């Protein structure tokens, strides 16, 4: 069976994601589509709108055959480390190709950019560091660095391109036998906050609309029925969706009771940012107001969100340094085709394939995952808190037969 990988967050799964899956299967002739998916906290440092289990069900209903989890130590990171963990997991489970969305859908631009970067890595990275030190954003610093080598083959101001570039670099750096492919994204931009197309919208705009209206009907045109049903069930069970504001009291407690020395141990706390965190936390009444007060050119909103997630989960620089590579493949769900594929590769997979969380106790990556799960569940009062926490430890991989797919 030919396995093809996708790297996803599905926050939530929408029609653009559905298009990506269909195009991926069609262009690659995949027998098995494998999604490596961030868990309860995401690459930009946000809590996922619903749990990884609810999002895995959305993915399986839409045609994904296997869903595996990207551990927190790689999921809540800048593009390079995020990509490093994700492509290694897909390679370990036997994916022959990786297919990602991009602005142009032309893989040649990514290959050309990666080749130039590999040949000029030291110079390129030095130029980026210089730009960042001057207070530039990463896209701006990268664009200026490319100009030193002639015209940039990629527009690195676009998030999909930044991630795609990181995926190709990670495949080459790790010498993985996995071919990268790309397809053009549809209509809505990654961060678009409004609806500009009758059926395609960004996950950002969907979450914003849900926050503003509270009505699932307001996003019905932009998501498959299975997504709507999972969102409905989740809110019915737990009473709410997740966003940063619900965690702000917990973050405030952590920052007010931590010393600056404590904060300097946390991953992402550099260049004296701990002073600004302590300076502004007492007076901020919302998470959004707090980040707006703390952010600088160097410390962007996204970077601060990741840092705050690390503060909540107590993810330290020492733990980050030790998290060099994934150590296991955690299975979240599978279709019948996925079950057959996993049976075929179980003995040949490069990492242990784990279905039960209890088997991972003691693994340093999973110990961090447990802390993230404890924080994520803190959005709810008891007895819902304990129920959500139990889901992390007791849930077996989801199985979806062909009949159940919508």
UniProtKB/Swiss-Prot annotation:
Coiled coil: none annotated. One of its GO terms (cellular component) is cytoplasm. GO terms for biological process: tRNA modification. It catalyses: cytidine(34) in elongator tRNA(Met) + acetate + ATP = N(4)-acetylcytidine(34) in elongator tRNA(Met) + AMP + diphosphate. It is an enzyme of class 6 (ligase). Keywords: ATP-binding, Cytoplasm, Ligase, Nucleotide-binding, RNA-binding, tRNA processing, tRNA-binding. Catalyzes the formation of N(4)-acetylcytidine (ac(4)C) at the wobble position of elongator tRNA(Met), using acetate and ATP as substrates. First activates an acetate ion to form acetyladenylate (Ac-AMP) and then transfers the acetyl group to tRNA to form ac(4)C34. Belongs to the TmcAL family. This is tRNA(Met) cytidine acetate ligase.
């Amino acid at each position: 069976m030919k396995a093809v990988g996708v790297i996803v967050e599905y926050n939530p799964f929408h029609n653009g994601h559905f298009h990506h899956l269909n195009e991926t299967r069609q262009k690659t002739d995949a027998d098995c589509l494998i999604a490596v998916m961030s868990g309860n906290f995401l690459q930009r440092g946000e809590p996922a709108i619903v749990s990884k289990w609810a999002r895995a069900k959305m993915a399986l209903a839409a045609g994904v055959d296997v869903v595996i989890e990207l551990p927190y130590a790689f999921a809540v990171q800048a593009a390079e480390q995020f990509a490093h963990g994700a492509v290694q997991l897909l390679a370990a489970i036997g994916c022959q190709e990786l297919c990602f969305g991009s602005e142009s859908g032309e893989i040649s631009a990514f290959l050309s950019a990666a080749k130039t970067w590999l040949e000029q890595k030291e110079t390129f990275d030095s130029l980026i560091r210089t730009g960042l030190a001057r207070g530039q954003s990463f896209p701006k610093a990268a664009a200026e660095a490319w100009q030193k080598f002639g015209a940039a083959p990629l527009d690195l101001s676009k998030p999909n391109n930044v991630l795609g570039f990181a995926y190709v670099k990670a495949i080459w750096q790790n010498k993985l036998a996995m071919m990268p492919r790309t397809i053009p994204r549809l209509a809505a931009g990654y961060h678009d906050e409004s609806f500009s197309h009758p059926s395609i919208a960004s996950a950002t705009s969907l979450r914003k609309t849900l926050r503003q209206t509270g009505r699932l009907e307001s996003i019905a045109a932009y998501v498959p029925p299975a997504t709507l049903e999972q969102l409905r069930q989740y809110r019915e069970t737990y009473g709410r969706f997740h966003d940063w504001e619900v965690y702000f009291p917990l973050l405030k407690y952590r920052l007010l009771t931590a010393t600056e020395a404590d904060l300097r141990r946390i991953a992402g706390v550099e260049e004296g940012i701990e002073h600004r965190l302590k300076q502004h936390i007492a007076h901020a009444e919302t998470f959004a107001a707090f980040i707006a007060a703390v952010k600088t050119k160097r410390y962007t909103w996204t970077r601060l969100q990741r840092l705050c997630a690390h503060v909540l989960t107590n993810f330290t620089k020492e733990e980050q340094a030790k998290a060099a590579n994934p150590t296991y493949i955690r299975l979240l769900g599978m279709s019948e085709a996925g079950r057959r594929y996993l049976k075929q590769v179980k003995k040949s997979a490069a990492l242990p394939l784990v279905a039960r969380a209890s088997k991972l106790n003691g693994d340093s990556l999973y110990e961090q995952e447990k802390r993230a799960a404890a924080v994520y569940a803190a959005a709810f009062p008891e007895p819902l808190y304990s129920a959500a926490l139990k889901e992390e430890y007791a849930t077996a991989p989801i199985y979806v037969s062909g009949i159940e797919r919508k």
